[in-house]
Amino acid sequence: EEDGFLHANKTTLGADDGVGVCYMLALLDDESLKHPALECVFTVQEEVGLNGAMGLDKSILKAKKMIGLDRGKEKIITVSCSGGRRAVVEKELSYLKNESPCYQLYVGGLQGGHSGGVIHLERGNANVIMTRVYYHLSLNNIEFLLGSFKGGLKDNAIPRECVSVFASNDDFKKIKEVVLKVENDLKEELKESDEHVFVRLEKVDSLNEVISVKESQDIISMMYLMPNGFMHKSLKMDLTNISLNMGVVEMNEKFNIYFSIRSPMESAKDELSNKLSLIASMFKAKYVLDNNYPGWNYDEGSKLRKQYVDFVKETEGITLKEE
């Protein structure tokens, strides 16, 4: 506390929750206000997985209507919220000694962004692009042995960069021609969202270990089939309803692909999970659900929302924006 203000210690996370806490404490503190019975719920660890809310015993609550105050902006009301699901596809790897020249692929120049906020802008995903480059090498009968693959930092962030090293005995000029063709196609396809996208190819020192051609092709084929990005929007509101993001790819003892799946509908999250699980099983990989939290879908006939919107319009002359 400083000069009558409470400050977070070295973080701004939770500031929107803090506004909601203040609203509730002010209502509880002012005995002059007239209102129906209130049940104020305070939970912890929202930013790391809604841990407090997930552990709440809902049977202790008697109220039939709920107002969520996890919002810091004024003149805007939240009328729907995507639930989320974090998942990983894991594939065991068998390394072998490398005896071939090595090359590095680097995908960059992308804007990226939070998958919960800008996925509808359909920006390029570096992991998806890297997969596409490798798949087109296969289409042109170029054999490669994966040695490393690293893209993205967080499952819910659209990856801006991806770096991968592979070994190949095929002609470098032929490899370069394929990579350049894919890069030119991407520049045309993404000129409205990621005009600076690039795919860079260069010779590097040989790696000691790589995985086989068959295992490399299986991984790339599996990733190439996996859905990614913006899927569906609400026709009632201009909001994304279903999406998923191939946020992180890592190659170590295992090949791991981390996804963030988002939708206010559990059934939609289930469908995307089922697709990922099925594709993984086709290539002897494992689908693991890491975390799941619910959302809520838009209720077109909400009487409580209409009462609030009408009241603010009547008393403040403000037309609230719904998001």
Regions found by a protein language model. Give the residues of each.
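An extended, acidic, His-containing surface patch that forms the Zn2+-binding/catalytic region
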Residues: 200-245, 250-252, 262, 266-271, ...
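A short, glycine/Asx- and small/polar-enriched loop/turn
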Residues: 157-162, 253-255
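Acidic-enriched catalytic cores of C-N bond-cleaving enzymes acting on peptides and small amides
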Residues: 96-100, 119-150, 169-243, 276
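Predominant activation on well-ordered alpha-helical scaffold segments within soluble catalytic domains
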Residues: 21-29, 64, 127-135, 176, ...
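Metal-dependent peptidase/peptidase-like ectodomains
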Residues: 57-126, 183-187, 191, 243, ...
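Acidic/histidine-rich catalytic neighborhood of metal-dependent amide-processing enzymes
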Residues: 7-94, 98, 147, 234-237, ...
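Alpha-helical metal-binding/catalytic segments enriched in His/Glu/Asp
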Residues: 2-47, 103-107, 114-138, 167-169, ...
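A structural signal for small-residue-enriched, beta-sheet-centric alpha/beta enzyme cores
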Residues: 116, 150-159
